[in-house]
Amino acid sequence: MLDIAQLETVYDTLAEAIDQAGPEKTELFLVKLALLQAQELGHAQQFAELTQRALKDL
């Protein structure tokens, strides 16, 4: 589990990468990132559950 400082680092890294991708490539970047993370996680059901958690309260 990440602590607050680590979460802030992850957030900053993600924000910088989204800026680098640019508005025309943001969706593609996020899909590629999600697929890479799913591969690292190695558990499709857990990925599906996390996806649903991320959709809550958008």
Region spans (language model):
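N-terminal intrinsically disordered, cationic/polar leader segments
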Residues: 2-7, 11, 17-20, 24, ...
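An amphipathic alpha-helical micro-motif enriched in hydrophobic residues
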Residues: 27-40
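A short structural micro-motif
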Residues: 36, 54-58
